[in-house]
Regions:
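Acidic helix-start/capping segments at beta-turn-to-alpha-helix junctions
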Residues: 105-119
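Active-site acidic/histidine clusters and adjacent loop/turn architecture
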Residues: 59-109
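C-terminal segment of N-terminal export signals and the immediately downstream linker at the start
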Residues: 20-54
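A mature extracytoplasmic/lumenal domain signature
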Residues: 45-47, 56-58, 110-112, 144-146, ...
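Structured segments of extracytoplasmic/periplasmic soluble domains
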Residues: 46, 73, 92-103, 124-127, ...
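Charged, often glycine-rich, active-site loop that binds/positions anionic groups
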Residues: 116-132
């Protein structure tokens, strides 16, 4: 399903979920994603097989225990090191799942990366930034089985999220909470 600009605006995301701090982008997304309705995510970590399939937002706020469990699934599996992930990233995934009518779990290829892990990846590939937002818990590389990664990247760009990177060859989309940019 390809969603046009009107569909994204209709979902309450016209402001862009990662607008400048002064504009209340996070609050706008929190209100626009689903109003007061509970927000659910279905996630599978590729490297570990671990899953999260639960509500992470209810009664008008984030569920701290659910966020803690999500942080663990998004951890750096090579070091078993976790960090608090930016919950706006979860809101983006939740919204994308709704707009794509997804029934399966997002597969997380990469979430948080410890600085050592990121440095090793950057040495091995020019495609890895030495100052990656993965190290701040503000980025994830994901795919959604049965959904085209190009369509996912296009939707994320229409949602005006921060960074959106399409890695066609690897079949995933990079999403982050940084400045708006596309590659």
């Amino acid at each position: 399903m390809v969603v046009g600009r009107r569909g994204v605006l209709g979902a309450g995301l016209g402001l862009g979920c990662f607008a400048a701090a002064g504009s209340g982008g996070a609050a706008a997304l929190a209100q626009g994603v689903a109003g007061g309705a509970p927000r659910r995510l279905s996630i599978q970590r590729v490297q570990t097989g671990e899953t999260f399939d639960d509500v992470y937002w209810k009664d008008g706020r984030y569920d701290r225990e659910a966020l803690r469990r999500l942080d663990w699934v998004f951890r750096d599996p090579s070091l078993d090191e976790a960090t608090p992930m930016d919950p706006r990233l979860f809101d983006v995934l939740h919204t994308m799942a709704r707009l794509l009518d997804a029934t399966g779990a997002f597969q997380v290829v990469s979430g948080y990366r410890a600085p050592e892990t990121n440095a090793a990846r950057a040495r091995a590939s020019r495609r890895v930034s030495r100052v990656s937002l993965h190290m701040s818990g503000m980025a994830a590389d994901v795919r959604l089985p049965g959904r085209d990664s190009t369509a996912m990247a296009r939707l994320a760009a229409e949602m005006q999220v921060g960074g959106v990177g399409l890695y066609r060859r690897d079949g995933f989309v990079h999403l982050d909470c940084g400045p708006a940019r596309r590659w």
